[in-house]
């Protein structure tokens, strides 16, 4: 895998965070109006995982079934007063003049076959990801950081739980009888 970026996901709230929300439990406790991301999005999967870790039922969030198609749309819903809070990325919150409560750091990587690492296109991409201009661009985005940008990383380092499937050996029929009926 090739390092790409780290980003922060968290709570998008009104400027000044008037409800004092710091966690998913706070949203449930206060009855704050929540705006969700659609089923199947990475943010929704993350939210459901965080709810499970906190021991909260999804229905504890008022508005859990309401969703917007993007982080920008979540921020717009909060800015317009249609929701008190939503899960999203910091850059979307800051673009609308909203506050942001960080919850999770996510690491992003690019995957390719090991044999592709020596290909000119892959080398060019890796070089681009390590240029000062690209690194500065990543640093300028609120909530993003160029973590290991362009570096080749071992899968076992990035995903310690991952195990490669071993190739199954072909069954040898030597010294075995095979009877076919037609």
Where are these regions (language model features)?
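Short acidic active-site motifs
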Residues: 23, 73-74
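A ligand-binding cleft/hinge motif common to bilobed small-molecule-binding domains
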Residues: 75-104
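Short beta-strand-centered segments that line the small-molecule binding cleft or hinge
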Residues: 1-7, 78
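N-terminal hydrophobic or amphipathic helices and topogenic motifs
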Residues: 22-25, 132-182
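Short loop->beta-strand "edge-of-pocket" segments that line small-molecule binding or catalytic clefts
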Residues: 25-45
């Amino acid at each position: 895998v090739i390092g790409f970026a780290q980003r922060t996901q968290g709570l998008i709230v009104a400027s000044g965070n008037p409800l004092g929300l710091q966690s998913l439990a706070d949203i449930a406790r206060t009855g704050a109006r929540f705006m969700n991301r659609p089923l199947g999005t990475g943010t929704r999967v993350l939210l459901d995982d965080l709810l499970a870790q906190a021991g909260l039922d999804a229905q504890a969030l008022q508005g859990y079934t309401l969703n917007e198609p993007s982080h920008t749309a979540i921020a717009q819903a909060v800015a317009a007063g249609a929701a008190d809070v939503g899960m999203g990325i910091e850059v979307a919150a800051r673009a609308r003049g909203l506050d942001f409560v960080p919850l999770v750091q996510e690491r992003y990587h690019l995957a390719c076959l090991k044999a592709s690492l020596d290909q000119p296109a892959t080398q060019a991409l890796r070089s681009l990801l390590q240029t000062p201009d690209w690194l500065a661009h990543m640093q300028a985005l609120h909530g993003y950081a160029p973590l290991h940008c362009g570096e080749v990383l071992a899968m076992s380092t990035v995903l310690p739980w991952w195990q490669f499937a071993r190739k199954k050996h072909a069954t040898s029929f030597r010294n075995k009888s095979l009877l076919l009926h037609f």
